[in-house]
Every structure is written in C-alpha cells, then in structure tokens.
A protein has these predicted regions:
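A short, N-terminal "cap"/entry segment at the start of jelly-roll beta-barrel domains
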Residues: 22-65, 151-163
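Short beta-strand His + acidic residue motifs that chelate non-heme Fe in jelly-roll/DSBH
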Residues: 78-80, 98-99, 120, 125-131
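Short acidic-glycine-tyrosine-enriched beta hairpin
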Residues: 58-60, 102-123
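Conserved short histidine dyad/triad with adjacent acidic residue
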Residues: 62-83, 111-112, 121-122
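Bacterial N-terminal signal peptides
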Residues: 8-16
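Bacterial N-terminal signal peptides that target proteins for export
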Residues: 1-9
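Double-stranded beta-helix
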Residues: 28-30, 107, 127-163
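Glycine- and acidic-residue-biased ligand/ion/polar-headgroup-sensing regions
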Residues: 72-75, 82-103
Length: 163
C-alpha cells in the first residue's frame, strides 16, 4: 500500500508542469462565486440527474480542465471504470465514496467527506458512489473520458438502446 501511495504521489507531482504550462496561457483572472456557477445536465456517461459545471478549459479537448460534478440526493453508483488520463478530485460538499478494483463492492470503499482530496493515475480500475447530494471538483489534462469495464454498465449504451 505504501508503494502504491508513493507511486500515485509521484504521478501527481509529474503532472504539475503541464498544469503550470496551461495556467501560463491564461490572459485574465477568473473568479466563480457559488451563484455564478452555471450547472448543466451531466454527460451521458454519468448517472441520471447529475449536473456539471465547466470552470476552466474544455474537458473534451487536450489541455488542463477543471469541472464540478453534482450528484443529486439518493444512491448513485458509478460502476467500475478507468480514465485514460490521471484525475484529481476534491470533495466540495457531501460525501463521495471510492473503491478500487474490477467489482463494485461498497464494503471495500473509502468514504471521503467534504474537504477530501484524491488523485489517481491513468488506467486505475475503480468505482464510486454517493448517497446524498454531493459536489466534487475534477481537474486534469484532457481529453477526459470514462471507460466502463463492462460496457453494459455504461449509461451511454443504455441511452442508445432506448426507443
């Protein structure tokens, strides 16, 4: 476990120069007060009712991005998946739960209350869930994507099958 933590920490530090380079491209300061944040329906890859606010960059393109995700009250499961890029997550409000591995198992997860921070390297198999309204902030180097281990778990596939 200690080796894994060291490896993850090293990766997070390795990505810092890319984030700094992106920040140097900024031409003006940006401030987002809570009432200024524009929430839109979340991407189809996430549970129904999810909302997303893009704060910086474009998560669908190359380059640094920061987004906030809001999960509504109730149990919301995000099945085992990976990301092609490293991801950095801060819990803004509520509790975000994450577990590692190929099978969804809430007993093996870690509850992260507001104020928690988590980063993981590209390709790490994990799953997540919320039980009440939860807001997280994700930052990374795009393009951002989520790849479900079992395509049947991907909400995008369910929407394609709907009449």
């Amino acid at each position: 476990m200690k080796k894994r933590l060291i490896a993850i920490s090293a990766l997070c530090l390795a990505l810092a120069p890319a984030a700094i380079a992106q920040a140097e491209k900024m031409t003006e300061a940006k401030t987002y007060l809570p009432g200024d944040i524009v929430w839109k329906d979340g991407p189809a890859a996430l549970p129904p009712g999810s909302k997303r606010a893009i704060l910086e960059g474009d998560p669908g393109k190359e380059g640094f991005y920061t987004v906030r995700m809001m999960y509504p009250d109730g149990l919301h499961k995000i099945a085992p998946h990976t990301h092609p890029q490293a991801e950095h997550l801060t819990v803004i409000s509520g509790t975000f739960n994450v577990g590692m591995g190929e099978k969804f198992d809430q007993s093996g997860g870690q509850a992260m209350p507001a104020g928690s921070y988590f980063c993981m390297p590209a390709g790490m198999k994990h799953f997540a869930w919320t039980t009440g309204e939860t807001v997280i902030q994700l930052s990374g180097i795009g393009p951002q994507n989520i790849v479900y281990l079992d395509p049947a778990d991907d909400p995008r596939n369910a929407k394609q099958k709907a009449p």
